[in-house]
Amino acid sequence: MAIDSLINKLQYVQLEPPDKILSLYLNTDMRDPEQQGGEWKIALKSGFSRLKEYLAASDPEEEKCLDGIRAKMNQYLNAMGKDMPRSLVFFVSDSGIWEPIKLQVPVDTRFYWEETAVLDQLKGLRQTYPSTAFILTQQHEVKIIETVLGKIEAVERYEYDMINESWKNSHSAVDKAPPFEENRMREHVTENQSRLYKRLAASLDQKAAAKRWERMVIAGDKETADILDQHMNKPIHSKIQKNLLNENEHKVIEHLIKEA
């Protein structure tokens, strides 16, 4: 996964003065009551000012490096405008390290100016919000939302094909069978629920292995969740009895992360 590769790369980097790495964790979540007035901008300005003041007195060469970093970061933030994620993380050096990370999970605002990247908080978030597949079920439809660190990486939607008795990607280019009446489809699914969800369980196990999902969460009716749980090899982290298949995916993830 990209975030794991980045952590592995950065943890072995060590610079020599005056070149250092700015590790910045910035809470930009507008849903946070303490961020309603854009307080992150104040925190950012204040943090840079304190660091600059310290370096001006201790090492003017490092201060110059910080000035270059600050200019580049300001340009990046200005280009984002109001399209802000919940959090931003930066690992930046004057010599060319430039790793901005947008997150949809909260962080504690912190500044670090050291010869190595300070990765503790990012590693902690990686453990708290692992690679997770949220499986939303509703009758003959299933949606899979893949996330890492709370960020949506991929979305797949499947519908049950009653003629071929198989699950098909609803965005597939394969020709679909003629539509059946909704009540007939529901009757078929109800009568054959155990069998058809057993097939889905086998498919999910294959996906979980191929994509290295670390956690799976099922949201839907209890009976369906129990059938999938019973027939899957990979354990289900949690089962949530809510019908969320047709809701906005970002809101769904925000909601399920809290419950899972």
From Swiss-Prot:
Pfam families attached to this UniProt entry: baeRF_family5
InterPro entries (alphabetical): Bact_RF_family5
Record protein name field: Uncharacterized protein YocB
